[in-house]
Amino acid sequence: VGLDRVGEALSELQVLFETSGYPLQGTIQQNWLLPTALGAIRPTCLAPLTMLAGDLTSHDPMLIVGFTQFHDFYPRLVADNLESQGFIARELNLDIPALLNSHLVSSMSLARLFDTPEFRRSVAQAILPRLGSAQRVGFPAVLGIQHPLEVLLDLEQQIGVPVFEIPGLPPSIPGIRLHNLLVKTIQASGGQVYSGMQVLSSEITAGKITSVVSEAAARTKHHYAHHYILASGGFLGGGSTADEAGYAQETIFNLPVIAPANRSDWFNPKYSSPGGQPIFQAGIVVDPQLAPVDPHKEPLIANLSVIGGALAGFDPLH
């Protein structure tokens, strides 16, 4: 694949999302340093425009805003941990009238409310008297589903300082935005997207996949294509399994998974070990074209590419 091709792919992705109204900004030459919902620093080369005002290469004072009825984001935790790292941050928990009748509010509910001008106005009016010396305001990543840039710009205009999102627990609203845009793009190109199906198995003839078999509502369906991409993840995503003896394999095409043979070697004694956890680095070995190969580098399936968490050496947690 190579760094150049990765850069080209990311540039194409940026063009796609720019034209779709949800820009991803950055380059592979330099990372943004963005705050997490724990107040830690998360490096990333590309990020939605809605998150960029939170870049921690700037030391502008921050106000971290949460909502009393939204229990998946704790502004004090974010602010305290940022303060401990030398940043200036205060927390603010809001009681907005539209939320007072709710004991618990979900991220989806909040995002839908932020899509309405009335809710944004009430939030801005609650923040302004308590803005103080803050030069930017951070929210949980719930600033609308349909038109996040419109929500962002409206809040910035009303509050008078830059606004940014901080991603947190699933369901991820930024992830839903990305998913929706990608689905629309695939469908506009003539593709089909199936939701609620589980791919169970495959049919392979002479080293080539002839179909994959999915199931939904107790009905199976065969899917035919010239080429297939495996993006089912590793052990965490259910794309790989292992038996009690330690033998690991991928679940759809029964591809061999490279993992420590001894189960006692799957984990390091320290959770935060610099080397990560060996079992989460387990995966499928591929050639330079991402086609799966066996331990002797011999090709296994000609019309299959493996990507993401299913790849050997990729550690989603480290």
Locate each region found by the language model.
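Residues forming the flavin
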Residues: V1-E8, V15-H318
